[in-house]
Design a protein with these regions (language model features):
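Short acidic/glycine-rich loops and adjacent helix/strand connectors
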Residues: 1-375
Length: 375
């Protein structure tokens, strides 16, 4: 059976194709459009689909839209519609509700009734728990937001997800980190990795104050809302300089987020007793925090979905639909499911661009020599 997964709601639009339980193709729209993150994460972009990625996935497998048994869209507008006090969510929800029609228009031959909404964090969880080598694992999803939550903790048993805890919005470790990213003069929903790096240059001297507002609650949840950052450091203007209070603030937030994540994972282990923890969600891209979880929790193994951000929900949506149909396949063997090119194709493009090149027999040895010569 053939399942196409789609992420389009926030940022990093992507598509993934699962055939008979196995991932056969996956790609982010940015690889075709050459626009970083595919689009900006605003409600008014929710109608934009990963059209090129979808078509490439189908072509890679030799399928047409009519061959699809179902399409999974990694956001459920019915849940999001219940969120109060967000003036922009109705726009996003309206576009999401119309996704079946948008998809049928983008993929002629697709029956719009085959489009199914998969809850955002369930898609994240599936991208980890259904793709990992172990069929028995705990799963931890932490990001900015889904429809109404910012966190999911659960466990997988032979493909079945049991949800043990969710953290409701507005508490969100991901949105906390995004807010700090913006305060430090970087692009939110894009440059969080720069904040993680900046943290290594600072001292966590604001940690005691931050612990008062960002902390685990002991029941699998947490409190985390962005404070007035000017209490700690003025807003940074991106003028190429950094350090001082800004680096210390980054270090402090990184430290408190790590502490909460360790507490969440430890609580989850107490509920499941599993050897293996699988992770997904944008916060799982914080490799420094992941290393803390691996070192400081009882889990013996930690498996992080390589596409932990929202692009991975396309993969998760497809895997979730396949699992529901009893099409549970093999673990994800690689992250390299995207487009590739042959050596001859690359050579032809270089000739067209009149770029000189060589094809050494001992490629690794020659590259090593160049690197050794500071090349």
């Amino acid at each position: 059976m053939n399942y196409l997964g789609i992420n389009a709601i926030f940022h990093d639009p992507a598509a993934a194709l699962v055939v008979d339980g196995r991932v056969v193709a996956a790609a982010e729209e940015e690889r075709f459009s050459r626009r970083k993150h595919g689009k900006r994460p605003v409600p008014f972009s929710a109608w934009e689909l990963p059209e090129q990625a979808m078509r490439w996935c189908l072509a890679e497998a030799g399928l047409t839209p009519a061959d699809l048994d179902a399409v999974g869209y990694s956001f459920d507008p019915a849940i999001a519609a219940e969120m109060p006090d967000d003036p922009y969510d109705p726009v996003r929800v309206d576009y999401a509700r119309r996704a079946p029609g948008f998809l049928a228009e983008a993929l002629p031959g697709l029956d719009r009734d085959k489009v199914r909404f998969v809850e955002h964090h369930v898609a994240h969880a599936a991208s980890a728990g259904l793709a990992a080598p172990s069929r028995t694992s705990s799963v931890l999803v932490v990001d900015g937001r889904g429809e109404a939550h910012s966190h999911l903790a659960g466990r997988y048993r032979d493909g079945e997800l049991e949800i043990l805890h969710r953290q409701a919005l507005p508490e969100s470790l991901g949105l906390l980190y995004e807010s700090l990213t913006d305060h430090l003069g970087f692009l939110r929903s894009s440059d969080e990795f720069k904040v993680m790096a900046l943290a290594s240059y600072g001292e966590p001297r604001f940690l005691p104050e931050l612990r008062e507002i960002v902390r685990a609650t002991g029941d699998g949840g947490f409190t985390a809302q962005a404070p007035d950052w000017t209490r700690f450091a003025p807003r940074r203007i991106d003028d190429g300089t950094w350090g001082g209070d800004h680096a210390d603030l980054a270090a402090s937030v990184q430290a408190v987020v790590e502490e909460v994540l360790v507490d969440l994972a430890t609580w989850l282990h107490g509920q499941t007793g599993d050897r293996v923890l699988t992770m997904a969600g944008g916060t799982a891209l914080n490799c420094v925090a992941n290393s803390r979880i691996w070192r400081d929790t009882p889990f013996e193994e930690v498996w992080v979905q390589p596409a932990s951000g929202d692009s991975g929900t396309a993969l998760g949506a497809a895997l979730h639909l396949a699992q529901e149909a009893g099409d549970l396949g093999a673990p994800q063997p690689t992250a390299a499911f995207g487009r590739s090119w042959s050596g001859e194709e690359l050579a032809q493009w270089l000739r067209t661009a009149q770029v000189p090149f060589t094809t050494p027999e001992d490629l690794a040895g020659e590259v090593a020599d160049v690197l050794a010569d500071n090349g």
